[in-house]
């Protein structure tokens, strides 16, 4: 199985390269034929570690040469740009968070993938964290009264501002409570600070989302019988293997682990949050 990694700026590229290099008994049939990045330092980091030996001069250079593509660019705008040529060619793609940096690109990428039979997976790896599994089980088996999710955000960066890190909270939220958000109301007192509060209206209950500058991931759920369930996680590195294994299984089996809309839906919520705190009003989810 031959793959290429496009956009090797973030830690996911290192994690995937390390998994392949250090675990030949599990990934011996997988070869990284090359990488691409607009940042020379990122290319040097990956090649110096021996994860890849070839760096392409353009992101579409691996067309016709790979069985799958991994897109891990830091800027979400590049996810659409890097993945689209491969999607049009029907090549399976893993696309890191955010899936895309705007709703129209996300819809178009998913629609093109479906039309061309290109399998897709990706998004935030935090949907795999073990600590939220009991909460997801409670949300499915008991009546929910309310809940919270808290995750870090980075508002001041060159990789899309709010969009850069915000999908993690969304995917924890959706893993626990499902895709049934009716509306969002978001508050951002100061765009220069890492602080946003969001009310996710699920119809019969609300969940409060807290974006902060603390690199901890927490969630809580209160059921109708007033029992409270909590999750706390500060070690998420192991989830890189979960998402890479999901991609490998998808390519080998020819079966997507999710629907195309599952990849677009978090982008819709992120767009709604940004519009809500910018326009200072409740945004309904279509």
What are these regions (language model features)?
Residues 1-50, 141, 258:
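N-terminal Rossmann-like dinucleotide-binding module
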Residues 45-51, 61, 69-74, 250-286:
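C-terminal helix-rich "cap/oligomerization" subdomain common to oxidoreductases
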Residues 100-159:
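A contiguous active-site-proximal alpha/beta segment in oxidoreductase catalytic domains
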Residues 48-110:
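Beta-loop-alpha module in the N-terminal Rossmann-like domain of NAD(P)-dependent dehydrogenases
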Residues 191-244:
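C-terminal substrate-binding/catalytic lobe of Rossmann-fold NAD(P)-dependent oxidoreductases
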Residues 149-214, 261-264, 268:
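Rossmann-like dinucleotide-binding domain that binds NAD(P)(H)
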Residues 13, 43, 79, 106, ...:
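A general structural signal for well-ordered alpha-helical segments in protein cores
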């Amino acid at each position: 199985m031959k793959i290429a990694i496009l956009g090797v700026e973030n830690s996911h590229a290192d994690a995937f390269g390390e998994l392949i290099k250090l675990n030949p008994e599990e990934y011996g049939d997988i070869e990284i034929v090359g990488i691409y990045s607009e940042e020379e330092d990122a290319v040097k980091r990956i090649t110096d570690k021996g994860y890849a030996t070839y760096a392409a001069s353009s992101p579409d250079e691996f067309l016709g040469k790979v069985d799958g593509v991994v897109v891990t660019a830091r800027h979400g705008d590049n996810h659409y740009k890097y993945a689209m040529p491969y999607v049009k060619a029907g090549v399976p793609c893993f696309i890191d968070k955010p899936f895309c940096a705007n709703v129209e690109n996300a819809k178009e990428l998913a629609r093109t993938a479906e039309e061309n039979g290109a399998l897709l997976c990706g998004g935030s790896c935090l949907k795999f964290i073990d600590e939220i599994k009991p909460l997801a089980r409670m949300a499915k088996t008991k009546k929910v009264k309310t809940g919270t999710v808290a995750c870090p955000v980075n508002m001041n960066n060159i990789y899309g501002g709010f969009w850069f890190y915000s999908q993690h909270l969304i995917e924890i939220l959706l893993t626990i409570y499902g895709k049934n958000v009716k509306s969002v109301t978001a508050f951002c007192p100061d765009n220069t600070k890492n602080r946003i509060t969001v009310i996710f209206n699920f119809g019969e209950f609300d969940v409060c989302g807290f974006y902060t500058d603390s690199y901890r991931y927490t969630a809580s759920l209160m059921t109708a019988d007033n029992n409270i369930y909590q999750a706390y996680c500060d070690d998420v590195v192991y989830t890189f293997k979960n998402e890479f294994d999901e991609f490998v299984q998808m390519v080998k089996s020819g079966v997507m682990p999710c629907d195309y809309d599952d990849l677009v839906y978090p982008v819709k919520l992120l767009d709604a949050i940004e519009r809500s705190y910018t326009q200072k009003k409740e945004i309904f989810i279509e």
